[in-house]
Structures are given as structure tokens and as C-alpha cells.
Amino acid sequence: MKTCNLTDRMKVKMIMLLFQILAISTLQSDSAYIPDRYTQENVAVRGKATQSALASGGGAVLSLPGYAIDGNRDSDSSHGSCSHTTNGPNPWWRVDLLQVYTIASVTITNRGDCCGERITGAHILIGNSLENNGINNPQCSTVGIMTAGETRTFHCSRPMIGRYVTVYLPKTEYLQLCEVEVNALLPAN
């Protein structure tokens, strides 16, 4: 009996991933369609978050990057449920999902107690590279105008494969995220 070496295992994983991509290729970007034999699950809660900078001053303890993946959509920043960067050029926030997933959409809850317009123009990027803090990864969607406290799902034009999801704001501004949900397609049991 032949034993599999690491190379063979990687080949099998890649083939399984390709079959998964083919199986979900009918996913529509403007719908919540989930293919048969698949479920959609927020995998961000399993990950580790980081961001370009922490808000300074007395509020820093209330602005950790992990607060945006704690499963809590509370949009009041003073409750310790939102991430918050400093006001600087090109802020970013990123979650490492700790493994590669097929991602259909990303759901963002905007800050509700103030400043809802700050997130306008943010890019949602998905991929496997940490180059330039994940900013070079392919784009899933762009955040348009969101009202304070709004929760909105951004569908990728096609399912995307990646380990890292980055929210990048290409301007000088604060980046505030009260919840980021990464909706991955997983085979149903």
C-alpha cells in the first residue's frame, strides 16, 4: 500500500477546492443563492483580526480589531463592540481566517453612534497574500454610502478563494467596523 506524501495531499486538496469552485460557479452576485449541498457560514469568528493602527487616547481599549469579529452587531462604539483605527492615510483592517475558504460575500455593520459616512469608498479584498497588508489581493466589492448603524451584505461578483479578508479605505480617515462577517460556502453534512 502506497502512503501519501505531503505533495499528494496538497494535490488532493487542490482538486477538492477546484470541484468546490465548479460546484458553486452558478452563484449570482446579486442574490443570496446557495447551491444545493452547501451551507453559508460566517467563518470570521474563528479568525484573528489586525488593523493598521489603534485609535489613540482613552478610547483605545474600546477599539481593538477583534471586536469586529466577535459575533456582536452592536453598532455603538462606546460599548466596546467596534474596531477603530486612527485618523490616517489609507487605514485597513484584516482578518486571517486561518485557512483558505470559498467566500461568497462579506457583511459589514457600520458604526451607529456617529460618523456613518466614514466607511464610504472602502474596498473589500480577498486573497492569500499578505503583501502590502493584503491590499494587493483581488477586490470583492466596494462599500458605497452606508447609514450609521446599517448592516449590509456585499456579494462578490463570483465566489472568491482566500484566507485573508481586508477592508481598505483609500483616503485619510478613520476606519470603524462594528462587525465583519465573512460568508463562506461550506459543503453541507
UniProtKB/Swiss-Prot annotation:
A motif (Cell attachment site) lies at residues 111-113. Gill mucous cells. Residues 1-31 form the signal peptide. GO terms for molecular function: calcium ion binding; carbohydrate binding; fucose binding. GO terms for cellular component: extracellular space. It comes from the Eukaryota. The keyword Calcium applies. Keywords: Calcium, Disulfide bond, Lectin, Metal-binding, Secreted, Signal. Homotrimer. Acts as a defensive agent. Recognizes blood group fucosylated oligosaccharides including A, B, H and Lewis B-type antigens. Does not recognize Lewis A antigen and has low affinity for monovalent haptens. This is Fucolectin-5. The lineage of its organism: Eukaryota, Metazoa, Chordata, Craniata, Vertebrata.
